[in-house]
Amino acid sequence: MAKGEGKVVAQNKKARHDYTIVDTIEAGMVLTGTEIKSVRAARINLKDGFAQIKNGEAWLSNVHIAPYEEGNIWNQEPERRRKLLLHKKQIQKLEQETKGTGMTLVPLKVYLKDGYAKLLLGLAKGKHDYDKRESIKRREQNRDIARQMKNFNTR
């Protein structure tokens, strides 16, 4: 766990497979009461999510937060756009890096820190199919080497 990181509620493993993560940044999320209760119950899905900068504000889209069961009329739409809390300079930097360079902002994980839901946002570049195959091959080779070293060291 990184410094200051709390309980991890959800991770986006698909993002690390589909993208090369260049940089990460922590952002707060503007949530309603029933949404934060669902997040604390780990009823959140980051798989198809992405973030974008519009009018100097950061917005999170396509992240599914399941409706809170006891929330009845106060429940929000599960995949609504949610505002991200970042400093102005951070937003300007992210906007500059994503504009026209093939970079995108993907949510990597949601965790609770001091009672607040935080989002780890990744500045990412898409991988091609051959890049994915290369990383899978590299991972398998490292696994085989580790297995052989383990067997060698136990003899």
Swiss-Prot record:
The keyword RNA-binding applies. One of its GO terms (molecular function) is RNA binding. One of its GO terms (cellular component) is cytosol. It is found in: Cytoplasm. Coiled coil: none annotated. PANTHER family: SSRA-BINDING PROTEIN, TMRNA-BINDING COMPONENT OF TRANS-TRANSLATION TAGGING COMPLEX. Belongs to the SmpB family. Required for rescue of stalled ribosomes mediated by trans-translation. Binds to transfer-messenger RNA (tmRNA), required for stable association of tmRNA with ribosomes. tmRNA and SmpB together mimic tRNA shape, replacing the anticodon stem-loop with SmpB. tmRNA is encoded by the ssrA gene; the 2 termini fold to resemble tRNA(Ala) and it encodes a 'tag peptide', a short internal open reading frame. During trans-translation Ala-aminoacylated tmRNA acts like a tRNA, entering the A-site of stalled ribosomes, displacing the stalled mRNA. This is SsrA-binding protein. The gene is smpB.
